[in-house]
């Protein structure tokens, strides 16, 4: 299980990469959270499947994937993105942003408490996605965060537990120091978990 439904605006449509003579494109999708904030999500798709234009509002179904991208310094950066064939949701989405994904907890951090007393926990979910019309399996490692009582519940879980999660895919910006006086603004993506259950 790996399904996400999004409603938002496409921007910055541009070429991404090419595999077996099939061209792929990428874009930013601007998704309104409903509280005045916006998420900027990475979208990828086959070029021929895109019938939309810049700044057009779309509703789509896809799945959340990860890609380990090599950097010039020899390290790797994990990008989180949504791959879609631009399938349209069967019903009008209740939310602009919702996912349902199952998998295995492969990393589980200690629960944390913020300065204002709120609890949160980070974990990584390993998801095995079987590509449609093929026997190919795609492994993704998805960063997750949960807050409050749900964070306390997850803190009792263990690595290798099989779970199913629901929530929203969010973006957040942060500062990365490149020198003592200079910094760069970076964007990270993570799954905000609002529901979780163990599965056999």
Predicted segments with their positions:
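Single-stranded nucleic acid-binding surfaces, predominantly the OB-fold ssDNA-binding core
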Residues: 1-200
């Amino acid at each position: 299980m790996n399904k996400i439904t999004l409603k938002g605006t496409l921007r910055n449509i541009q070429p991404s990469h090419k595999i077996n003579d099939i061209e792929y494109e990428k874009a930013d999708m601007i998704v309104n959270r409903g509280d005045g904030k916006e998420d900027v999500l990475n979208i990828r798709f086959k070029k021929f499947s895109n019938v939309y234009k810049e700044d057009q509002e779309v509703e789509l179904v896809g799945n959340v994937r990860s890609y380990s991208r090599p950097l010039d310094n020899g390290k790797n950066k994990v990008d989180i993105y949504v791959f879609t064939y631009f399938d349209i949701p069967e019903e009008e989405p209740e939310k602009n942003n919702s996912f349902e994904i199952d998998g295995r907890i492969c990393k589980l951090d200690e629960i944390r408490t913020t300065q204002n007393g709120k609890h949160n926990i980070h974990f990584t979910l390993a998801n095995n996605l079987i590509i449609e019309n093929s026997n190919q399996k795609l492994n993704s490692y998805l960063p997750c965060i949960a807050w409050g009582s749900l964070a306390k519940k997850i803190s009792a879980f263990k690595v290798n537990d099989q779970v199913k999660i629901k929530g929203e895919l969010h973006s957040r910006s942060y500062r990365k120091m490149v020198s003592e006086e200079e910094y760069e603004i970076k964007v990270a993506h993570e799954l905000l978990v609002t529901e979780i259950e163990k599965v056999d």
